Amino acid sequence: AVYSNPAGLAFMEDGFHLSFNGQSAFQTRTITSTFAPFAGFGGNATKVYKGEASAPFVPSVFAVYKKGDWAFSGSFAVTGGGGKATFNEGLGSFESQVSVIPMAMKAAGAGLVNGGLLPENPFANTDRYSVDSYMRGKQMIFGVQLGATYKITDYLSVFGGLRMNYVSNGYEGHIRDIQANIGDKMVNLNQTFAAYADQFNKLAAAAEVAGQPEAAKKYAAATAMATDYAGQTQDKYLDCDQTGWGVTPIIGADFKMGKWNVGVKYEFNTKLNVENKTRVDDTKLFAPGVNTPHDIPSLLTVGVSYEILPVLRASVGYHHFFDTHAKMADATNLITGERTGKQHFIDKGTNEYLAGIEWDVCKWAQISAGMQRTKYGVEDSYQSDMSFAVS
């Protein structure tokens, strides 16, 4: 109740109340990507990337001191974020950049032949690739909440409070040992193109000495091209954390009469940026020191419970997140190509519908069961394999 219905704390018995909770969460996140060039690594244009997420123990602490018409409460909990996930075969958005290399190699080889720099295209049969790819990410919001509840009448109470939110994100991964077939042999492309660059550079120097400026110019261009490919196929690593904090004002009200109880809570929009703390970023996606919008959207919750029996209660609830009012990281509009905040690709915000029942088995034991239906209402442009929402 400290989190879900803090205004209802006024109807507790006087005294100090403490709750320590632990939850476990295990999840497999499956991303299916279809891209024709993927067939060059495994023979299938559709690939499935599985992310294993596990949190064996997620703690939370809630405390209330109730005296007369007043109740003072506090809590510490993980209040948001997507948790942790490890993709041992990387992500499709990363592999897609590697998968087009064989086609580019064919075209580059044909250009070298047409320019008279090579007698035949060494990449004419290049149609396979391989890559060692890995990604691990975490997104967590830790919240410390403090507030006060006051009972106005025997039936009505109100709450006011604040939650300090600390965001901790982290991304770690690599793309390395990029290979492709030249003939029937798989070779490391970074080493191969570095060798071509060295060879063309020597030929350019020799042509310059021999008084063949046109040939020297062609070999210099080939050197630049091979050097560029060597750079594109070198091992790339990512190790970046993001942190930020913000304060959420919270208000609530609770109406309790007879067997009915109705609780309402509103959390205001939280202005928040996360700053990159980058150790390694060969991907150029997380420049050091850059701040990214990471607002926590305002939230309206309504809950209604009814006491069927003294030991049996049923409840329903509704949550609405005002996502469109929160500033978020940029995403690309898939129709126009424009980069803009992800909040512009959300229809009307997130809606959650809840229902549950709880039974007091005895004085010291209680069991409950419930369900939740979440509808995000996001457009395709909102989604990516590094940040997605699935209803």
Task: Place the predicted regions along the sequence by residue.
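Outer-membrane beta-barrel porins/channels
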Residues: 57-58, 64-391
